[in-house]
Amino acid sequence: DVPEGHYEEDNMKDTVVPNRNKIFSSIIQAVALSIAQVRGCDVDIAMGIHAGDHAIYPDCRQEFRDADYNAFKEGNWDADKVKYITPYLYGDKFSILEDGEFWCDKLGLDFDEVYRRTNTSYKPDAEGRSDYKSASSVERIEAFLKLGRRDPVEYIDGWKTAKKHVEQLLLNY
């Protein structure tokens, strides 16, 4: 079962998937290095890890990212052609949304259309609608509330219910 509540609660360690980001980074490093070698160019790779993840997920911390990148460089020829970008390492979900809002505007994209196509929920229903009680959903809704926007994804019981649930939950933090 996926625990419900805020990431500040002790039970959120149950959401940890051991070495998850190491697995992701190993795959993206291998692909990036292959592209760099075949095309003879440098490749930047980005990871969306953010400060909200640090307390629960050890592989989202700067120390882990540095150690992972150093191991990658030590273990591969031409690894210096691949650079890591972690633009949100010290930001939260709100800063990601704020950045997304800026770039959607700058690029002429419809913010709601872009974010309607994303899913943060750990417990979507069979129709793909987001829950609003798991920590990932709570954190997302909290960021949208801070941004002053309605989240365009569809929630199981609707936005009003999801918003009210998170507002009540946040009174405890």
Task: Report each predicted region and the residues it spans.
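Nucleotide-activated chemistry modules centered on ATP-dependent adenylation/adenylyltransferase
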Residues: 1-173
